[in-house]
């Protein structure tokens, strides 16, 4: 029998953060594609759009007027998914019809007044201000809620309803599914190994290097060994950090650089504004020590072969198990092969 080769043969990889397996089918990477294709926007956006609900000085759909902001701008979402004053749900003893109240708040974070510039096109000082805003919002909301979720949906392909570069922060009175699962599995690993899972993982990736995409003094971005999306990345501090609020000034500044380099490589891969959903996971604000936690950011981009061909999580993946064609190592190699200077800045 031919010896096993992970570049040629189907195999499964285990995700210790979710407890789930991913089917890797590298032999399928060369299959022809005649399916749906995305149409990337070629529109050059203005620095200010008078019809945009998020631009500085404009009036939002509710009639509220945005200030003439110069940096980041945060406001409560006009169509928030959560409310702080939700009444208690009635007790239910039916194991098949369980319900509980959900309280919280949802805020919008405009990254800058410039309607045309996404994260990789912003300056390092502007990116540093965004990180500081993530920190202050997390610290403020963490005083009231156990879970604070900072995230960004970039691009229409990821359901973004407004092209003005922005993110969101939702605070929950409960621990959401993904957070609860990561909490439980990191805690189990810590109990067995006596060290945080993702701190150990960073050391493995630093020693290996084959999945590294970006490295700065204090941060490492890798295509994780267990990646599900084609060019998924995991962004991690090199030392033990529980929450984004715990970063030193040096780690914060280094994070701004890592974000610029990583998102520039994404855009450069297919010479387009690369869509993704990203977000931060850190220790919950539950009054516990949480030494098993390690701060990290997930980037989930859907593009697969080009700016027009995306991956769909359907069929087998919805009903059985996540599957990918490119190996994590091949995806990281492709991201390393492009510049970390944005193609619009380099003049390419």
UniProtKB/Swiss-Prot annotation:
Parts forming coiled coils: none
Entry's EC annotation: 2.7.7.12
Residue positions binding Zn(2+): 52, 55, 115, 164
Record: active site: 166 (tele-ump-histidine intermediate)
Binding-site positions, UDP-alpha-D-glucose: 28-31, 61, 77-78, 153, 159-161, 168, 311-312, 316-317, 323
Cofactors required: Zn(2+)
InterPro entries xref list: GalP_UDPtransf1, GalP_UDPtransf1_His-AS, GalP_Utransf_C, GalP_Utransf_N, HIT-like_sf
UniProt-annotated binding residues for Fe cation: 182, 281, 296, 298
Superkingdom classification of source: Bacteria
Annotated PROSITE patterns: GAL_P_UDP_TRANSF_I
Pfam families, A to Z: GalP_UDP_tr_C, GalP_UDP_transf
Reactions the enzyme catalyzes: alpha-D-galactose 1-phosphate + UDP-alpha-D-glucose = alpha-D-glucose 1-phosphate + UDP-alpha-D-galactose
An example Gene Ontology biological process: galactose catabolic process via UDP-galactose, Leloir pathway
GO molecular function: UDP-glucose:hexose-1-phosphate uridylyltransferase activity; zinc ion binding
Keywords associated with the record: Carbohydrate metabolism, Galactose metabolism, Iron, Metal-binding, Nucleotidyltransferase, Transferase, Zinc
CC cofactor note: Binds 1 zinc ion per subunit. Zinc binding seems to play a structural role.
Similarity field: Belongs to the galactose-1-phosphate uridylyltransferase type 1 family.
Listed name of the protein: Galactose-1-phosphate uridylyltransferase
Native source species: Salmonella typhimurium (strain LT2 / SGSC1412 / ATCC 700720)
């Amino acid at each position: 029998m031919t010896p096993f080769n992970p570049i040629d043969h189907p195999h499964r990889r285990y995700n210790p953060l979710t407890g789930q397996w991913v089917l890797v089918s590298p032999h399928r990477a060369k299959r022809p594609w005649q399916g749906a294709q995305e149409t990337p926007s070629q529109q050059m956006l203005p620095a200010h759009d008078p019809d945009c609900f998020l631009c500085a000085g404009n009036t939002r759909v509710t009639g509220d007027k945005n200030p003439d902001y110069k940096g980041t701008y945060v406001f409560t979402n006009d169509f928030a998914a959560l409310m702080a004053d939700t009444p208690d749900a009635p007790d239910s003893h039916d194991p098949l019809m369980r319900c509980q109240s959900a309280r919280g708040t949802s805020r919008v974070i405009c990254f800058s007044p410039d309607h045309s510039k996404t994260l990789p096109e912003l300056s390092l000082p502007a990116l540093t201000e965004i990180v500081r805003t993530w920190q202050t919002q997390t610290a403020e909301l963490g005083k009231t809620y156990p879970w604070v979720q900072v995230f960004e949906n970039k691009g229409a392909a990821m359901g973004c309803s407004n092209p003005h570069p922005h993110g969101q922060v939702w605070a929950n009175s409960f621990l959401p599914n993904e957070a609860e699962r990561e909490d439980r599995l990191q805690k189990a690993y810590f109990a067995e190994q006596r060290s945080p899972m993702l701190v150990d993982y960073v050391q493995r990736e630093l020693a290996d290097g084959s999945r590294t995409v970006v490295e700065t003094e204090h941060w490492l971005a890798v295509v994780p060994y267990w990646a599900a999306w084609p060019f998924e990345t995991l962004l991690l501090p090199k030392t033990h950090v529980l929450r984004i609020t715990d970063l030193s000034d040096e780690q914060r500044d280094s994070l701004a650089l890592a974000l610029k380099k990583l998102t520039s490589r994404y855009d450069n891969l297919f010479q387009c504004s690369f869509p993704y959903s990203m977000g931060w996971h850190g220790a919950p604000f539950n009054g516990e020590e949480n030494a098993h936690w390690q701060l990290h950011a997930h980037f989930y981009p859907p593009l697969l072969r080009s700016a027009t061909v995306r991956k769909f999580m359907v069929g087998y993946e919805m009903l059985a198990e996540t599957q990918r064609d490119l190996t994590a190592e091949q995806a990281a190699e492709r991201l390393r092969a492009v510049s970390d200077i944005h193609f619009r800045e380099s003049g390419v």
